[in-house]
């Protein structure tokens, strides 16, 4: 809120920041983009995403390097999402960050300084009011 709109309705610093980064201009009712710097080392990490994420459209996890850019790599893709990702038998999805050498599904190869952005399109009231959050990425056990 306060990012885009009439001169009277915006918060100047939010407006400047959002226009500088160039994306994220949709209102929160249409999309939310939590950016996460997990402070985890390069290794095998994962997020266990439940079968039902309270969004009206879809969700995605996008991987970035420490400069906020996609990192060139041998494996395809910089994103795992609810449309193209492989689901577990119970409908949940395991998103792997690191440990991709064995060809596992839904895996994003990580690098030093990695971070990620979760994109939630048409977030439900649970997300908007903060009673539901996307599962954290944790070291694999």
Where in this protein do the model-derived segments appear?
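A compositional/structural signature for long, glycine/proline-rich flexible linkers
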Residues: 1-141
């Amino acid at each position: 809120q306060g990012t885009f709109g009439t001169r009277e309705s915006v918060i100047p610093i939010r407006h400047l920041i959002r226009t500088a980064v160039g994306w994220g201009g949709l209102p929160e009712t249409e999309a939310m983009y939590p950016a996460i710097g997990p402070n985890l080392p390069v290794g095998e990490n994962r997020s266990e995403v439940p079968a039902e994420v309270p969004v009206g459209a879809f969700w995605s996890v996008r991987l970035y390097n420490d400069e906020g850019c996609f990192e060139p790599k041998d494996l395809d893709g910089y994103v795992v999402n609810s449309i193209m990702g492989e689901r577990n038998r119970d409908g949940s999805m395991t998103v792997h960050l690191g440990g991709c050498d064995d060809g596992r599904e839904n895996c994003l190869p990580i690098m030093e300084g990695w971070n990620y952005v979760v994109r939630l399109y048409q977030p439900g009231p649970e997300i908007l009011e903060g009673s539901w959050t996307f599962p954290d990425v944790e070291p694999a056990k």
